[in-house]
Protein backbone atom coordinates (compact mmCIF):
# COMPACT_ATOMS: atom_id res chain seq x y z
CA UNK A 1 0.00 0.00 0.00
CA UNK A 2 1.46 3.42 -0.92
CA UNK A 3 2.16 5.86 1.90
CA UNK A 4 -0.53 8.48 2.45
CA UNK A 5 0.08 11.78 0.71
CA UNK A 6 -0.18 15.13 2.43
CA UNK A 7 -3.54 15.72 0.80
CA UNK A 8 -4.91 12.46 2.22
CA UNK A 9 -3.59 13.22 5.70
CA UNK A 10 -5.07 16.68 6.06
CA UNK A 11 -7.40 17.45 3.19
CA UNK A 12 -6.16 20.28 0.99
CA UNK A 13 -5.18 22.70 3.76
CA UNK A 14 -1.70 21.42 4.57
CA UNK A 15 -0.36 21.20 0.99
CA UNK A 16 -1.60 24.75 0.29
CA UNK A 17 0.04 25.95 3.50
CA UNK A 18 3.31 24.22 2.67
CA UNK A 19 3.36 25.72 -0.82
CA UNK A 20 2.71 29.28 0.36
CA UNK A 21 5.10 28.95 3.31
CA UNK A 22 7.93 27.61 1.19
CA UNK A 23 7.46 30.35 -1.40
CA UNK A 24 7.54 32.96 1.38
CA UNK A 25 10.75 31.52 2.83
CA UNK A 26 12.29 31.62 -0.67
CA UNK A 27 11.15 35.25 -0.92
CA UNK A 28 12.91 36.00 2.37
CA UNK A 29 16.11 34.48 0.99
CA UNK A 30 15.69 36.64 -2.11
CA UNK A 31 15.39 39.79 0.02
CA UNK A 32 18.58 38.77 1.86
CA UNK A 33 20.40 38.33 -1.46
CA UNK A 34 19.07 41.68 -2.70
CA UNK A 35 20.34 43.29 0.52
CA UNK A 36 23.81 41.89 -0.12
CA UNK A 37 23.76 43.08 -3.71
CA UNK A 38 22.71 46.58 -2.65
CA UNK A 39 25.54 46.61 -0.09
CA UNK A 40 28.04 45.72 -2.80
CA UNK A 41 26.63 48.19 -5.33
CA UNK A 42 26.49 51.04 -2.81
CA UNK A 43 29.74 50.03 -1.07
CA UNK A 44 28.08 50.24 2.34
CA UNK A 45 29.30 47.50 4.65
CA UNK A 46 28.18 46.76 8.20
CA UNK A 47 31.50 45.25 9.29
CA UNK A 48 34.97 46.82 9.08
CA UNK A 49 36.52 43.62 7.73
CA UNK A 50 34.06 43.62 4.83
CA UNK A 51 34.76 47.29 4.12
CA UNK A 52 38.52 46.63 4.10
CA UNK A 53 38.03 43.80 1.63
CA UNK A 54 36.04 46.08 -0.68
CA UNK A 55 38.09 49.25 -0.71
CA UNK A 56 38.73 50.52 2.79
CA UNK A 57 37.26 51.55 6.11
CA UNK A 58 35.52 54.54 4.53
CA UNK A 59 32.99 52.00 3.22
CA UNK A 60 32.09 50.89 6.76
CA UNK A 61 28.94 52.99 6.74
CA UNK A 62 25.18 53.10 6.61
CA UNK A 63 23.19 53.58 3.43
CA UNK A 64 19.50 54.44 3.06
CA UNK A 65 18.88 51.80 0.41
CA UNK A 66 20.60 49.08 2.45
CA UNK A 67 18.58 50.14 5.50
CA UNK A 68 15.38 49.90 3.44
CA UNK A 69 16.26 46.32 2.46
CA UNK A 70 17.01 45.47 6.09
CA UNK A 71 13.68 46.92 7.22
CA UNK A 72 11.85 44.89 4.57
CA UNK A 73 13.60 41.74 5.76
CA UNK A 74 12.89 42.54 9.42
CA UNK A 75 9.23 43.10 8.61
CA UNK A 76 9.16 39.71 6.88
CA UNK A 77 10.53 38.07 10.02
CA UNK A 78 7.95 39.86 12.18
CA UNK A 79 5.05 38.60 10.06
CA UNK A 80 6.07 35.43 8.24
CA UNK A 81 7.37 33.56 11.30
CA UNK A 82 4.03 33.92 13.13
CA UNK A 83 2.24 32.88 9.93
CA UNK A 84 4.31 29.69 9.81
CA UNK A 85 3.08 28.73 13.28
CA UNK A 86 -0.52 29.87 12.85
CA UNK A 87 -0.92 28.32 9.40
CA UNK A 88 0.48 24.96 10.47
CA UNK A 89 -1.74 24.70 13.53
CA UNK A 90 -4.75 25.98 11.58
CA UNK A 91 -4.16 23.32 8.91
CA UNK A 92 -4.64 20.60 11.50
CA UNK A 93 -7.95 22.02 12.77
CA UNK A 94 -9.70 20.58 9.72
CA UNK A 95 -10.73 23.86 8.09
CA UNK A 96 -12.74 23.99 4.90
CA UNK A 97 -10.09 23.50 2.19
CA UNK A 98 -11.21 26.49 0.10
CA UNK A 99 -11.33 28.81 3.11
CA UNK A 100 -7.89 27.63 4.25
CA UNK A 101 -6.44 28.10 0.77
CA UNK A 102 -7.85 31.64 0.67
CA UNK A 103 -6.28 32.42 4.07
CA UNK A 104 -2.88 31.26 2.81
CA UNK A 105 -3.20 32.91 -0.61
CA UNK A 106 -4.27 36.29 0.81
CA UNK A 107 -1.34 36.26 3.23
CA UNK A 108 1.09 35.21 0.49
CA UNK A 109 -0.08 37.86 -1.97
CA UNK A 110 -0.15 40.55 0.72
CA UNK A 111 3.46 39.81 1.66
CA UNK A 112 4.57 39.77 -1.97
CA UNK A 113 2.95 43.16 -2.62
CA UNK A 114 4.41 44.48 0.65
CA UNK A 115 7.93 43.51 -0.39
CA UNK A 116 7.56 44.98 -3.88
CA UNK A 117 6.14 48.18 -2.36
CA UNK A 118 8.95 48.39 0.21
CA UNK A 119 11.88 47.68 -2.09
CA UNK A 120 10.34 49.51 -5.03
CA UNK A 121 9.54 52.60 -2.93
CA UNK A 122 5.93 52.62 -4.10
CA UNK A 123 3.67 55.45 -2.96
CA UNK A 124 1.84 55.26 0.32
CA UNK A 125 -0.47 53.65 1.31
CA UNK A 126 0.41 50.65 -0.90
CA UNK A 127 2.77 49.06 1.61
CA UNK A 128 0.56 49.62 4.66
CA UNK A 129 -2.51 48.30 2.84
CA UNK A 130 -0.60 45.18 1.79
CA UNK A 131 0.59 44.72 5.38
CA UNK A 132 -2.95 45.06 6.74
CA UNK A 133 -4.48 42.73 4.16
CA UNK A 134 -1.85 40.08 4.98
CA UNK A 135 -2.57 40.35 8.70
CA UNK A 136 -6.30 39.66 8.32
CA UNK A 137 -5.95 35.92 7.64
CA UNK A 138 -3.43 35.66 10.49
CA UNK A 139 -5.91 37.26 12.88
CA UNK A 140 -8.63 34.92 11.61
CA UNK A 141 -6.45 31.83 12.05
CA UNK A 142 -5.32 32.95 15.51
CA UNK A 143 -8.92 33.44 16.66
CA UNK A 144 -9.96 30.04 15.31
CA UNK A 145 -7.01 28.36 17.04
CA UNK A 146 -7.82 30.08 20.34
CA UNK A 147 -11.48 29.12 19.98
CA UNK A 148 -10.66 25.47 19.29
CA UNK A 149 -8.13 25.29 22.12
CA UNK A 150 -10.57 26.90 24.57
CA UNK A 151 -13.34 24.46 23.56
CA UNK A 152 -11.14 21.56 24.60
CA UNK A 153 -10.12 22.82 28.04
Curated annotation (Swiss-Prot):
Residues 43-61, 121-124 are cytoplasmic. One of its GO terms (biological process) is regulation of inflammatory response. One of its GO terms (molecular function) is glutathione transferase activity. Glutathione binds at residues 39, 74-78, 114, 118, 127-131. The record marks 50, 127 as: Essential for protaglandin-E synthase activity. GO terms for cellular component: membrane; perinuclear region of cytoplasm. The chain crosses the membrane at residues 14-42, 62-91, 97-120, 125-153. Pathway: Lipid metabolism; prostaglandin biosynthesis. Residues 1-13, 92-96 are lumenal. Its cofactor is glutathione. It is found in: Membrane; Cytoplasm, Perinuclear region. InterPro entries: MAPEG-like_dom_sf, Membr-assoc_MAPEG, MGST1-like. Pfam families: MAPEG (PF01124). Signal peptide: none annotated. It catalyses: prostaglandin H2 = prostaglandin E2; 2-glyceryl-prostaglandin H2 = 2-glyceryl-prostaglandin E2; prostaglandin G2 = (15S)-15-hydroperoxy-prostaglandin E2; 1-chloro-2,4-dinitrobenzene + glutathione = 2,4-dinitrophenyl-S-glutathione + chloride + H(+). It comes from the Eukaryota. Its main location: membrane. Terminal enzyme of the cyclooxygenase (COX)-2-mediated prostaglandin E2 (PGE2) biosynthetic pathway. Catalyzes the glutathione-dependent oxidoreduction of prostaglandin endoperoxide H2 (PGH2) to prostaglandin E2 (PGE2) in response to inflammatory stimuli. Plays a key role in inflammation response, fever and pain. Also catalyzes the oxidoreduction of endocannabinoids into prostaglandin glycerol esters and PGG2 into 15-hydroperoxy-PGE2. Belongs to the MAPEG family. Homotrimer. This is Prostaglandin E synthase. It comes from Equus caballus (Horse). The gene is PTGES.
